Amino acid sequence: MATSSSAWLMFSDHYPEILIAIACFLIFSLLLSARSSSEDSLPYNWPIFGMLPAIISNNQFNDFTTARLRKMGWTFIFKGPWLLDMDYIFTCDPSNINHMFNDNFENYPKGELGKVFDIFGNNIFNADGDLWHDHRKMAQTILWDGNYRTMQATFIRNKMDNALIPILDSAACKRKPVDLQDVLLRFTFDTSCFSVLAADPESLTMEFPPVPFSKAADQALDAALTRHITPRLIWKLKRFFNVGSERTLAVAWKVIDSYIYDKIAELKAKRKLVGKINSYDAVSFYMDNFNIHDDKFLRDNAFTYLLAQRNTQSLTMTWLFYALFENPKVELKILSELKSIVDESSERKFNDGFTLFDSNMIQSAIYLHAALCEALRIYPPVPFEIKDAHKADVLPSGHKVRAGEKILFSPYAMARMKGIWGDDCLEFKPERWITGNGTLKHEPAYKFFAFSAGPRICLGKELSFTQMKMVVATIIYNFHLQMVKGHVVEQSNSILMDMKHGLMVQVRKRSVM
């Protein structure tokens, strides 16, 4: 008995150290297993932890998910930690996406996921039901208005004239590399601020000034991603105690609110001073056409418009240029098309020897449009999205969905499935978007998901294409860009498909055409 008691006392003295050692061993084993997991198998479903260690230890979530979806026939069940309601259905099956966004649309509202993105407030992004219908009708009125579109096109042309071309020209003359992703993000931030708030922040200048709003917006989206992979109870506790990613979000939120509310106040003050002005920005539209003057309403909608325009357009153009660096023959075809357009155009615009493309000139740029579609297919700005099931359901793939269960679907993975896009799915091939008659080929939205699908399909799709074509055409026609030798292009693990290290390029002026 004495020996037994002594042994127990010895063990109890070292009990904490033993527990820590066991915990460290388990964590190390989990991470090692997760990293060595074969692409031909699902992540190991550990007791307590589920498959989460495989996600946490992987720095390329989109490729990790794609490999598993390919092996498992486009859909699989992801098991989260026990008792934390973190099980997901992962899918890239077009029939499942069509089911959620079209056939059974009402069963997959924003619902609880709106709380994850509460920084957007009560707007078209988070709304459901009648409120969403009201928001969508107002957004349609704004985005399809001729004056609004003309104002945007004019400002974009002026911004190219006064900022984009001078900066690229300076980089060419000085032989100084520039981060094209940063240039395009600044460009679209300036243009989106003008179209939404009638204000030009002038972030795209030779000095490349800090842009607190843009930094805060990126931090807010990263915090939202953290909420997705964190048990709801945990991130709510972090928010309550104001720590970690929730503290970062709170600080970013204040920066975002300060900027937008200040711009709304400036616009209202200007209107009060000079009376109603002929401005066709989104905020003025809400006040003039819908008699909505509530600052919170205007803030929520302004933030959504700003992010939608700034992020999706800039990232699409950035990835397009990366694809052109990898496929120079495609760039030559675009250049040839643009030369034909310029030769036939009576509306050629010059700026110190540079040619500017306006919204009329680029309407016939079919091959450029196809190249943008291909960039959106392979590099979707939003590589994955998540839906909540309101009621129990069965997906076309045969997978049962519990009420409240989350479904993650991946447009990024969809683009990489031979059964969806053919054996050449990994190739950057604009020709897949052009018919035998030389017209653009239509693909159903649940297959080409860059602009969403069903009743929630993006209202600004054609406007976005027009604006991107103006910018890309002007850059390609006037400059030859090359990626800096040795520069590494890597996706960020983010809600958005941005480049972790940017896109560093050398710029040369093209010879006179």
Swiss-Prot record:
This is Noroxomaritidine synthase 2. PROSITE patterns: CYTOCHROME_P450. It is a single-pass membrane protein. It holds the Pfam family p450. GO terms for biological process: alkaloid metabolic process; lipid metabolic process. Its EC number is 1.14.19.50. It comes from Narcissus aff. pseudonarcissus MK-2014 (Daffodil). One of its GO terms (cellular component) is membrane.
